[in-house]
Amino acid sequence: MKNNYNRINTFIVYLMVTFSLISIISITECTPNHDPCPPQYAEALCLNGGTCFSVTIMGSDNYNCICAPGFRGWRCQEKDLDHPVNQ
């Protein structure tokens, strides 16, 4: 019986983490009014012409990048082969 409680508790924690991540992704992708990053982050965080923005989630500042066309990844560090830049 105790093993079943452990499985249920583990599943509940998994659901809580999953829904938290979904909320963060939704906020960062759908919120049109992002605050700009502080200069020390803006210069170092985003690569390949990406634009740094910050979103406050549950009292914590989170820094992300909006990538220039042709790039993707958390820091715009990867070439997006599905959308190459015309040269």
UniProtKB/Swiss-Prot annotation:
Family matches, as Pfam families: EGF
Give start-end of the signal peptide. Answer: 1-32
| Disulfide bridge partners, by residue number | C37-C52, C46-C65, C67-C76
Q: Which residues form the EGF-like domain?
A: 33-77
Q: Which GO terms describe its biological process?
A: epidermal growth factor receptor signaling pathway
Localization of this protein: Secreted
What sections of the sequence does the record tag as coiled-coil?
none
Q: Name one GO cellular component term.
A: extracellular region
Q: Which SMART domains match?
A: EGF
SUPFAM superfamilies assigned: EGF/Laminin
What does the record give under GO molecular function? epidermal growth factor receptor binding; receptor ligand activity
As for family, the record states: Belongs to the EGF domain peptide family.
Alphabetical list of PANTHER family matching this protein: KEREN-RELATED
Q: What is this protein called?
A: U18-myrmicitoxin-Mri1a
Origin organism is: Manica rubida (European giant red ant)
Q: What is the phylogenetic placement of the source species in the record?
A: Eukaryota, Metazoa, Ecdysozoa, Arthropoda, Hexapoda
